[in-house]
Amino acid sequence: MKEGIHPDYSEAVVKCACGETFTTGSTKKSLHVEICSKCHPFYTGRQKLVDTGGRVDKFKKKYGIVDNE
């Protein structure tokens, strides 16, 4: 690699809107994020499951598709 053309990569503090802080590597000194693994619904278990069955039924009804069950 050439000398002097790469940015300095150092430890950075990441601050979330929920108040959580952690460190990571970055070319910036600090980062601010809106959501992290401590407050994201997928990781906290508060995730809503979307039922796509209603969409499939609507499509079948719209195009007259009959199930052969």
UniProtKB/Swiss-Prot annotation:
<dbReference type="GO" id="GO:0019843">
    <property type="term" value="F:rRNA binding"/>
</dbReference>
<comment type="subunit">
    <text>Part of the 50S ribosomal subunit.</text>
</comment>
<feature type="binding site">
    <location>
        <position position="16"/>
    </location>
    <ligand>
        <name>Zn(2+)</name>
    </ligand>
</feature>
<feature type="binding site">
    <location>
        <position position="39"/>
    </location>
    <ligand>
        <name>Zn(2+)</name>
    </ligand>
</feature>
<protein>
    <recommendedName>
        <fullName>Large ribosomal subunit protein bL31</fullName>
    </recommendedName>
</protein>
<keyword id="KW-0862">Zinc</keyword>
<keyword id="KW-0689">Ribosomal protein</keyword>
<dbReference type="GO" id="GO:0005840">
    <property type="term" value="C:ribosome"/>
</dbReference>
<keyword id="KW-0694">RNA-binding</keyword>
<feature type="binding site">
    <location>
        <position position="18"/>
    </location>
    <ligand>
        <name>Zn(2+)</name>
    </ligand>
</feature>
<dbReference type="GO" id="GO:0003735">
    <property type="term" value="F:structural constituent of ribosome"/>
</dbReference>
<comment type="function">
    <text>Binds the 23S rRNA.</text>
</comment>
<feature type="binding site">
    <location>
        <position position="36"/>
    </location>
    <ligand>
        <name>Zn(2+)</name>
    </ligand>
</feature>
<keyword id="KW-0699">rRNA-binding</keyword>
<dbReference type="InterPro" id="IPR002150">
    <property type="entry name" value="Ribosomal_bL31"/>
</dbReference>
<comment type="similarity">
    <text>Belongs to the bacterial ribosomal protein bL31 family. Type A subfamily.</text>
</comment>
<dbReference type="GO" id="GO:1990904">
    <property type="term" value="C:ribonucleoprotein complex"/>
</dbReference>
<dbReference type="InterPro" id="IPR042105">
    <property type="entry name" value="Ribosomal_bL31_sf"/>
</dbReference>
<dbReference type="GO" id="GO:0006412">
    <property type="term" value="P:translation"/>
</dbReference>
<keyword id="KW-0687">Ribonucleoprotein</keyword>
<dbReference type="InterPro" id="IPR034704">
    <property type="entry name" value="Ribosomal_bL28/bL31-like_sf"/>
</dbReference>
<dbReference type="Pfam" id="PF01197">
    <property type="entry name" value="Ribosomal_L31"/>
</dbReference>
<dbReference type="InterPro" id="IPR027491">
    <property type="entry name" value="Ribosomal_bL31_A"/>
</dbReference>
<keyword id="KW-0479">Metal-binding</keyword>
<dbReference type="GO" id="GO:0046872">
    <property type="term" value="F:metal ion binding"/>
</dbReference>
